[in-house]
Amino acid sequence: MKALTTRQKEVFDLIRDHITQTGMPPTRAEIASRLGFRSPNAAEEHLKALARKGAIEIVSGASRGIRLMIEEESGLPLIGRVAAGEPLLATQHIESHYQVDPALFKPHADFLLRVSGMSMKDIGIMDGDLLAVHKTQDACNGQVVVARIDDDVTVKRLKRQGNIVELLPENSEFDPIVVDLRQQELTIEGLAVGVIRNGNWL
């Protein structure tokens, strides 16, 4: 594949992220809206350029007729540092892929998150571990979730009562995080479904 310009890379990343999150490519109108193009025609020109460079295939007669031609890396993506306001699974956040069968976890894992800190050590989630996460916004009280509070991503046990959410640590040395949903934004990014142990303690 020929090298992409910065703008073409933005379009390509948007297509790939949209497929990752929704299971389908975006329409021309969605690309134009997300990237600030004046019209879907401008998006179409970028798509044609990507097709000429071998990055995508345009399927005629369909508003979502875009197929990625670059082979995706297999395995579960490992999410690194997350930029503010961007999707957790955006391409730029993926550090690498691990050859782990998602079906080993119930429900299945969609991605891995490297644990930072010891706030959940009492249930065996240690600093440096890889946390297997099932991507969902639905979570019940008592479940261990990956939550985003403003710009920060954290792993805690969920407790919600009305507009007040407590994110509880599993380590008495740490305090709960209390979020008033009327004043602060909180997003559930997924459920913890398993742990791959960091081997440094061996």
From Swiss-Prot:
Q: Which organism is it from?
A: Sodalis glossinidius (strain morsitans)
- List the keywords (alphabetical): Autocatalytic cleavage, DNA damage, DNA repair, DNA replication, DNA-binding, Hydrolase, Repressor, SOS response, Transcription, Transcription regulation
Which family does the similarity line name? Belongs to the peptidase S24 family.
Which gene specifies this protein's sequence? lexA
What NCBIfam families is this protein classified in? lexA
The annotated active site, in chain numbering, is 119 (for autocatalytic cleavage activity), 156 (for autocatalytic cleavage activity)
Question: Does the entry feature the keyword Cell wall biogenesis/degradation, yes or no?
Answer: no
What Enzyme Commission number(s) appear in the record? 3.4.21.88
Under the heading Pfam families, the entry gives:
LexA_DNA_bind, Peptidase_S24
The yes or no answer to whether the keyword Transcription regulation is present is yes
**What protein am I looking at?**
LexA repressor
Instruction: Give the GO terms filed under biological process for this record.
Output: DNA repair; DNA replication; negative regulation of DNA-templated transcription; proteolysis; SOS response
